[in-house]
């Protein structure tokens, strides 16, 4: 995977947000950890499995964290339950959150509560399109932290409404609107 980094570093990581050319590159994981450590920032590490390399990805991330001796708080989140379970075996004392984009026939709200309980996940992150008062009540009764994300950034107004209903955290790609909250 490191073999391709020199090519990835050439990509303009800021263009998506700023709609113009920037000098923002895709940082290495170690660079992110160093920045977080220097600024005393905790981090959510989203496990995004590379098909066919899920185990290698998880092992590599755990190795970097251990080698770096990252001392800030962190937790792992993923839509991929298998990746979370693999990482939990390697780093059993870390915190974990299961991300849910939609309810399906093979995975219900009760299944999600059972999974969080079985694997001692501290958090469940829901797509804002599927979150409602009933989901929030059910999850809170399970003593699991609720986070919400959206394909588009949540507005401050949407976030305030979610927080008032019991959601504890939101994910955002661009937090500048939230600077003064």
What are these regions (language model features)?
Residues 1-103, 118-131, 140-142:
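Metal-dependent phosphodiesterase/phospholipase catalytic core, i.e.
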Residues 19-22, 98-181:
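C-terminal active-site rim and adjoining tail of enzyme catalytic domains
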């Amino acid at each position: 995977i490191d073999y391709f980094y020199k090519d990835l570093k050439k990509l303009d990581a800021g263009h998506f947000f700023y709609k113009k050319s920037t000098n923002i590159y895709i940082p290495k994981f170690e660079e992110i950890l160093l920045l977080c450590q220097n600024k005393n920032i905790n981090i959510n590490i989203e496990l995004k499995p590379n098909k066919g390399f899920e185990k290698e990805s998880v092992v590599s991330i755990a190795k970097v964290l251990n080698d770096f001796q990252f001392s800030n708080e962190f937790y792992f989140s993923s839509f991929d339950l298998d990746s979370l379970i693999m990482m939990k075996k390697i780093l059993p004392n870390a915190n974990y959150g299961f991300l849910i984009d939609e309810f399906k026939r093979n995975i219900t709200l009760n299944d999600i509560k059972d999974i969080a309980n079985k694997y001692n996940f501290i958090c469940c992150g829901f797509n804002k399109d599927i979150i409602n008062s009933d989901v929030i009540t059910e999850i809170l009764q399970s003593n699991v932290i609720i986070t919400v994300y959206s394909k588009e950034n949540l507005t401050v107004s949407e976030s305030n409404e979610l927080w008032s209903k019991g959601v504890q955290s939101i994910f955002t790609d661009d937090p500048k609107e939230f600077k003064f909250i």
